[in-house]
Amino acid sequence: MKTGIRLTAAVLISLFVISAAGCTNEKSLSSETSGHTNSPQTPPAAADILKKAALSREEQISLYKEIVEGETAWLASLQLDNGALPMTYAADGKLTLNPYFSDFAALAMLESDKYFGQVKKYADWHFSHLNTADTDYNGLDGTVYDYTAEVSGGKVKRETVNTDNGKKHYDSVDSYAATFLCVLEKYCRKSGDAEYIKQNGADIDRVTAALLATFEGELTTTKPDYKIQYLMDNCEVYEGLAAAEKLYKSAFADKKELIGKITAAKEKVSNGIENLLWNKKGYYETAISPDGTVAYKFAWSDFYPCATSQLFMISSGLLKPESERARQLYKSFNDNFSTGEKKSSWEKISLPDSFFWGSVVYAAAIMGDEGRVESYMRLYKKAMKNHAYPLYNADAGRVCLAAAVMIEKLSQKG
């Protein structure tokens, strides 16, 4: 933890950042906001929110297909011989293995049918690294640590668990479990390999149990020794539970009691986000303590975590892109970070830090913001010929997922 802000959220989103394509969200309590009330009374006009593309529909589709092909190939090239998907690549030296980051890489790789085998190999790595109650420093079964891999000649020579102040480390339990469940559901759906899922049913149960164990009231806490309830984490938890619900109904239909628990938890976290995090001033609280105390003062001018966390409501599926509230949140975000000014123009990849923030373009793609997404993607494609720092696997994964969303939307328009 860094100064009270989740490293995963800060680094994950930024180094890249949740809500994986393929994790569908079915909860809908109203036609406008998927169960979220207190929306602004006057919705902003569409012209105030979305920008038109400069390229033709066909040119946009071509651009996004190139990005999907290029990013999936690069992400696949990162994979180590033991199946791990490191944040970056080096033939020799030390590489960070962050399972949460790796999940976004895997989700992106599943946009191509070329890499099903490699995603399966990554899932094998993840399953083999699940902690037991004895090996987890919080005594919780089904979690997974961050690791460092030492490689030589492109081969893994050793893996060691990362530590923080002398303790073995994972940044969270809730998000790590949720995003991995998204990977498994998407792998099963895209590849059709239900047999692999069934073979690993016991371990999937463990991951699901770890996720459910993080609930305190209507929301999840980051991990047992860091009891903060983050908007971003809980959006990802909603996605993960929606994915788990679909996965279990497809591959483990006989586990009716567990399916019922998953469905109830999905509804609980959706309601909890609305009941406990929505502020009538027009935003969701970034984080609270289990007693309801606000843990981080909100300001739209604070790019991370305040402003970016609002977009997770869109990318997670908790808000429909056409809903009044999604449009208002997206407009407020762009009022602050699509200004045309340096360090506050995300579509020009000009932001307060040096990272690519794939989570932002992913939310923009879901909103159907053709103009801003096109601007971002053209710059990204030009900058990423060598996939050099500060690009990380999860950021590239998010960009790829955004491109895939745009291909689908533009194809439907045809």
For each of these PLM feature ranges, what is it?
Residues 12, 16-17:
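Hydrophobic core
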Residues 46-61, 101-116, 169, 178-196, ...:
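Well-ordered alpha-helical scaffold segments within catalytic/enzyme domains
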Residues 35, 39-104, 111-157, 205, ...:
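Low-complexity, Ser/Thr/Pro/Gly-enriched N-terminal "stalk/linker" regions
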Residues 93-211, 231-234, 373, 377, ...:
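Aromatic-rich carbohydrate-recognition surfaces in CAZymes
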Residues 18-36:
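Sec-dependent signal peptide cleavage junction
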Residues 62-72, 80, 84-88, 93-100, ...:
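Extended ligand-binding clefts on enzyme/binding-domain cores
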Residues 1-9:
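Bacterial N-terminal signal peptides that target proteins for export
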Residues 66, 98-104, 108, 112-117, ...:
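Active-site core of glycosidic bond-cleaving carbohydrate-active enzymes
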